[in-house]
UniProtKB/Swiss-Prot annotation:
InterPro entries: Integrase-like_N, TACO1_YebC-like_2nd/3rd_dom, TACO1_YebC_N, Transcrip_reg_TACO1-like, Transcrip_reg_TACO1-like_dom3, YebC-like. This is Probable transcriptional regulatory protein MADE_1004275. It comes from the Bacteria. It is found in: Cytoplasm. The keyword Magnesium does not apply. Its main location: cytoplasm.
Length: 240
């Protein structure tokens, strides 16, 4: 599972290179979160976490504030979450999460990404049963037993704890996200997270051949260029 998360981080880092896309992604997510749960980060924990994550990804404060002000004012678009699943180049499994104010536009754009790369868009649930919806935390450290003890004392449900290359990765059911985060930060007030997110982690991996790589890269680039696409999860392992 740890390898899958490293693959996921590498894919996210590539996407993060396009700053305009990142700002737009966070602006939309923050707007929806503030609109649904309230614009005060002290009472809307999801908003607070999203703001912290945005700042860590160097999103300017004016982008964050604009999204919150827009939500607080009650105006703006009505974005709805949408999820698409299918098989990408090399027969890898793919989940595409979107936020959209126009369902017809979104499905047309996402379908085009699949069609133009000989990939196959599937029905709802086509591949998501092969992923685990997990809360994932990663930070520097090497004491697995101490981390497990902290989490057990806090009575939180944890799927796995891995230590590799001086980094601890904690996996838990997505419903336990805030309980795990609170337990860790209370035990280690100075803890700095390399990652703290809710993600879809693949149960299996699909090796992408050299022959399929150009089409796979085109597929990912096309999805990342879609304004409505927020996250792309896959089980592909690319040639090193």
């Amino acid at each position: 599972m740890g390898r899958a998360f490293e693959v996921r981080k590498a894919a996210m880092a590539k996407t993060a290179g396009a700053k305009t896309k990142v700002y737009s992604k966070y602006g939309k997510e923050i707007y929806v979160c503030a609109k649904n749960g309230g614009a005060d980060p002290d009472t809307n924990l999801s908003l607070r976490r999203l703001m912290e994550k945005a700042k860590k990804d160097q999103v300017p404060s004016h982008v964050i504030e604009k999204a919150i002000d827009k939500a607080a004012g009650g105006a703006g678009e009505d974005f709805q979450p949408m999820r698409y699943e299918g098989f990408g180049p090399g027969n890898c499994m793919v989940i595409v999460d979107c936020l959209s104010d126009n369902a017809n536009r979104t499905i047309t754009e996402v379908r085009n990404c699949f069609t133009k790369t000989n990939a196959k868009l599937g029905a709802q649930g086509a591949v998501s049963h092969m992923f685990d919806h997990q809360a994932v935390f990663q930070f520097e450290g090497d004491d697995e037993d101490a981390i497990l003890e902290v989490l057990m004392e806090a009575d939180v449900d944890v799927t796995d704890v891995e230590v590799e290359d001086g980094k601890v990765t904690v996996y838990a059911p997505h419903t336990e996200f805030y309980q795990v985060r609170t337990a860790l930060t209370e035990a280690y007030p100075d803890l700095s997270f390399i990652a703290d997110e809710i993600s879809w982690m693949p149960q299996t991996e699909t090796e992408i051949s050299e022959e399929d790589m150009p089409m796979f890269e085109k597929f990912m680039d096309m999805l990342n260029d879609c304004d409505d696409v927020q996250d792309v999860y896959h089980n592909a392992v690319t040639p090193s």
